[in-house]
C-alpha cells in the first residue's frame, strides 16, 4: 500500500460566524468540528496528518495535540495557497494525499476510504469527491464529457446557463497523487477577481497535462456540509445528533423522542436504558444497562452504573454506582462518588462527597466535602457546613449513623459508627461510636405568655 497523507484546511477566519471563538473550534455534539474531521482521518491508517492553521492557531493546536502536525498560513490567500504551506512536510514524497476542509464535521471515514480506493482503481492523479443536490446554487459544478470523464470544475459565478443546470457539485474534498499535487500547486495563478490561489485550479493544470482526473460521487450531501455561519452550525449539529441517536437505538437504547434528546458523540450508553425527551448527556459520560433518565436531566462527564434511575436531576463529573435512585431535582456536583443502593432524593446537593452503600439522603440536604459511610440515614434539612468564609473543611460520618432533621454538622467534624444525631442539633465536636449527639437549646414554655403577643383573636 502506498503512503497516505492528509491535509486539513483550518486556517479560515470564519467572519460569518460572528464569534470570538475560532470557526473550526465551534463544537458539534460535544467536539470541535475540526476534531471530528481529524478523528475520522485517524482511522484510515494515514502516515501523517498536517493541519493548516491561521487565526487562533494556538487554540487549534491545543485541541489537536498528538493527533496532527501543524503549519501556519500567515496570510489567507486561498485554498491552494493553504495546501502549499505543507510543502516542507510533504513535497517530494511518494503516496497519496487527502485534502479535507476542517469545517466539514459530518465527513465519515468510510467515505474517505472509498475515495482513496476509487482514486487507486482509476490510477488518477487527482480525484474529486462529488455529490448531487437539488439546489446547487453557489457550488462549483463538475463538468464531464460525453464519456463521463471529468473535464473541469466551474465555479457557480463563472458557469454558463447550461452548466448551472448541472446538479453534481464539488464538495471540497480531494485525493491527489502527492508529487503531482505539489508540482501543480507551483503553477496555480491568482489571476481572478479575489486575487487568491484556488485548489480547483490544480484540476485544470493536471487535465491540461493529460493526467487522469476522476470524480467519486457519494450518495449523501450532508457529509459535505460546510459550516460557515450559525445556521449551518445548527444544521450540522442536528444531522450529527440524528446520526448519534440512531446509532444508540441500533445498539439497544430506547430514546423516547430522539429529536429532543441531546447526546454528545463520546457518550456511551448500555442496553435497555431508557432516555426520555429533553435529556442532555455531555462529554465522556458513560451510562450502564437498564437505567432510566427522565426528562430535564443533564449528565456531564460522569459514570453511571446499572439500574440507576435519574429523575430530572443534574450530575456533573461524578460517579454513581448500581441500583441508585437520584432525584427529582437533585444536583451532584463534581467529585461526588455515590456507591451502590443509595437514595439521593429531591433537592439534595452533593459536592466532593463520598456516599456509602445503602445510605439514604432523602430530601433537602447539602453534603459538601463529606465522607458518609454505609447505611446512613440523613434527615431532611441537614447540612454538612464545610465553609467558614475562608477555608473548606471535611465532615466524616461513619456507618449505620442516623442524622435527625435540620442538623448542622460544622466541619471539621467526625461522627462515629452507629451514632445518633438528635434532630435540630448543631454539632461542633466529634461524636463517638454508639453515642447520641445532641446540641440544641433546652425548650422553655412560658405559660400564658402568648396572650400578650396579640398574634390572633
Curated annotation (Swiss-Prot):
Pathway membership: Nucleotide-sugar biosynthesis; UDP-N-acetyl-alpha-D-glucosamine biosynthesis; N-acetyl-alpha-D-glucosamine 1-phosphate from alpha-D-glucosamine 6-phosphate (route II): step 2/2; Nucleotide-sugar biosynthesis; UDP-N-acetyl-alpha-D-glucosamine biosynthesis; UDP-N-acetyl-alpha-D-glucosamine from N-acetyl-alpha-D-glucosamine 1-phosphate: step 1/1; Bacterial outer membrane biogenesis; LPS lipid A biosynthesis
Family assignment from sequence similarity: In the N-terminal section; belongs to the N-acetylglucosamine-1-phosphate uridyltransferase family.
Active site: 363
Region described as Linker: spans on this chain: 231-251
Residue numbers binding UDP-N-acetyl-alpha-D-glucosamine: 9-12, 23, 73, 78-79, 140, 155, 170, 228, 333, 351, 366, 377
Alphabetized GO MF terms: glucosamine-1-phosphate N-acetyltransferase activity; magnesium ion binding; UDP-N-acetylglucosamine diphosphorylase activity
Positions of Mg(2+) binding: 103, 228
A single GO cellular-component term on record: cytoplasm
Species per Swiss-Prot/TrEMBL record: Listeria monocytogenes serotype 4b (strain CLIP80459)
HAMAP family hit by this protein: GlmU
GO term, biological process aspect, one: peptidoglycan biosynthetic process
Identification of the protein by name: Bifunctional protein GlmU
EC numbers for this chain: 2.7.7.23, 2.3.1.157
N-acetyltransferase as annotated region, ranges: 252-457
Domain of life: Bacteria
Entry-linked SUPFAM superfamilies: Nucleotide-diphospho-sugar transferases (SSF53448), Trimeric LpxA-like enzymes (SSF51161)
UniProt lineage: Bacteria, Bacillati, Bacillota, Bacilli, Bacillales
Chief location of this protein within or outside the cell: cytoplasm
Cell compartment(s), UniProt: Cytoplasm
Role summary: Catalyzes the last two sequential reactions in the de novo biosynthetic pathway for UDP-N-acetylglucosamine (UDP-GlcNAc). The C-terminal domain catalyzes the transfer of acetyl group from acetyl coenzyme A to glucosamine-1-phosphate (GlcN-1-P) to produce N-acetylglucosamine-1-phosphate (GlcNAc-1-P), which is converted into UDP-GlcNAc by the transfer of uridine 5-monophosphate (from uridine 5-triphosphate), a reaction catalyzed by the N-terminal domain.
Needed cofactors: Mg(2+)
Chemical reaction(s) catalysed: alpha-D-glucosamine 1-phosphate + acetyl-CoA = N-acetyl-alpha-D-glucosamine 1-phosphate + CoA + H(+); N-acetyl-alpha-D-glucosamine 1-phosphate + UTP + H(+) = UDP-N-acetyl-alpha-D-glucosamine + diphosphate
Protein residues bound to acetyl-CoA: 386-387, 423, 440
Keyword set, alphabetical order: Acyltransferase, Cell shape, Cell wall biogenesis/degradation, Cytoplasm, Magnesium, Metal-binding, Multifunctional enzyme, Nucleotidyltransferase, Peptidoglycan synthesis, Repeat, Transferase
Cofactor binding mode and count: Binds 1 Mg(2+) ion per subunit.
Subunit composition and interactions: Homotrimer.
